Amino acid sequence: MSNYDWGYPNTVWFGNGRIKDLAKACKFLDIKKPLFVTDKDLAKTKMVEETLEINKRAKLPTIIFSDLKGNPLGSYVKKGVDVFKNGNHDGVIAFGGGSSLDVGKSIVLQAALNRPLWDCTDGGSFWIENDYVESMAKNRITNPDNVKPFIAVPTTAGTGSETSRAAAIINDETKVKKIVFHPRMLPTLTILDPELTVGMPAFLTATTGMDAFAHNLEAYCAPGYHPMADGIALEGMSLIKKWLAVAVNEGANLEARGHMITSSSMGATAFQKGLGAIHSLSHPVNSLFNVHHGLSNGIFMPYVLTFNRSAIEKKIAKLSEYLSLKEASFNSFVDWVLELKEQIKIPHTISESVKITDQDIEKMSPMALNDPCTPGNPKKPNLDDMVSMYEHSVQGKLF
């Protein structure tokens, strides 16, 4: 695939081997002493070693912060901010999956805020609620120059954190996964290099791909008028339909990898319109059981789809037509989702990934109901509905 530079929703440099332009990106943003944020496992790889060598050759002193892992905690951000400030760093490079990118952008934001990071969370869906202006006014950064440049380099194709203004961080004390949101969390520059995703195992390719699918799907189904988001989500799902299974089965296929990393960025661009109950159900499972976010999204997808049927049937029929499925119908789409999940080995029930008891459901259901993604669900759920969706996902029974 050829190299392309895009200007929406942020500056994006796309193409095979574009990681070689990392030092150029730092120079472009006037970063002279970057903090390199990645997870513990990735920090030990040759891929990170080779990436750091790019900056070394350009005489850019780059320090690694890797005290983090999947489903990131607020304490990771706090440690990162201390390292960032004590090292007098003037920018952040976040390299890795969604967890690394979310921690990286949170470090940049928290370092510039004179208030806790949690003040920029929840309060209703920032995408569709009327308190957006009030929330942002409360958390306005007095001196925008304090927000240092942030370069996002994804090595997975799922979260789309590289093109979003949000981060998912778990509060250490409450064990609740919170959505941190601020306009200044949008990465200053993103490098989309398909070659960096080639090393993903098949199952991780599948689960991150389902995360991208969930972002595009829930953005498309979210209530409200946002034809730009709808258009991006439609094409994102079209790419996923054509290329996800290929990427899973042919890991070295750079064309498939390129389209999947693009669809991931598209999903995060589109979900400024909203997300829904797929994510609401996932977040408690992620924070309490450390289940991979993309995996839980893939598991919950058909249950939420069929729960929402009365609110989205016509829209899903149009989506089925756009995707050239056998029939332009809701049932045809659900059947295809189930077939795709089976093809890429995504479990049908949550019980196949983690043992969930009735007591767990009782604990998680209020968390899901109060999740900031819930207001974006096309069919307004109550507590009993959340309980029911969890129970259906345990039993493998669609609505």
Task: Set out the residue ranges of the language-model regions.
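ATP/NTP phosphate-donor binding region
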Residues: M1-G91, S351
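Gly/Pro-rich interdomain helix-loop hinge
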Residues: L288-K363, F399
